[in-house]
Regions:
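N-terminal hydrophobic/helix-forming segments and targeting peptides
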Residues: 1-194
Length: 194
């Protein structure tokens, strides 16, 4: 069923006014649910990694949803200054026909951007040896900061890895706790191995 969103006011809203969803955080044994989980969980995962990372960089980008975000600039800076040539994109993907709640974090094999196969194969091999639950996706649309990194003239490998969510871009985005746990655990494992 399709959800309809609307604003009910006694006056007309001025064009260009920024509107946001009112956060109503819900949690049960299996799921967390709230607006903007696609942004919040990617950042939360990266912050969790700050507790254990010893050799690497964590960067926070913006404007990914609009294209032309800061990922390309950040990747260039990290490559030129610190010779960082591998990037893991910590974000949230969508529940689709082949991606389900509770089956683990999702390793994206491609979306509108196509990461280098040898790097993705390396990640898949590490994921298999880790024993951490994961699933894979192949998408023909959508994109991530990886797509922006792919467009810059630097040899930076990238891969999108994130928990899947339902009700994308609504006030009721929903993610399974097992998928969040496997996301954090796989990132920790990969940061040690890559």
């Amino acid at each position: 069923s399709e959800t309809k969103l609307f604003c009910k006011f006694n006056r007309e809203i001025e064009r260009g006014t920024t509107l946001t969803y009112k956060p109503v955080f819900k949690e049960n044994k299996e799921f967390v649910q709230c607006c903007y989980l696609d942004n919040r969980l990617g950042v939360w995962n990266a912050l969790e990694l700050c507790e254990t990372i010893t050799d690497g960089a964590i960067a926070f980008s913006c404007w990914e949803e609009h294209g032309g975000g800061t990922a390309g600039f950040l990747a260039r800076f990290l490559y030129e200054k610190y010779n960082v040539s591998k990037a893991l994109i910590s974000d949230i993907t969508w529940i689709t026909e082949g991606v389900h709640h509770g089956n683990g974090v999702v390793i994206s094999l491609r979306d509108t951007g196509i990461p280098r196969k040898i790097f993705v194969d390396q990640i898949l091999a590490h994921a298999k040896e880790s024993g951490i639950p994961f699933q894979t996706e192949v998408e023909g649309s959508g994109g991530s900061d990886g797509t922006e990194i792919q467009k810059i003239p630097y040899p930076i490998d990238w891969c999108f890895i994130g928990a899947p969510e339902d009700n994308v871009h609504t006030p009721a985005e929903k993610v399974h706790k097992k998928d969040i746990e496997s996301m954090v655990n796989l990132y920790r494992y990969l940061l040690e191995k890559l």
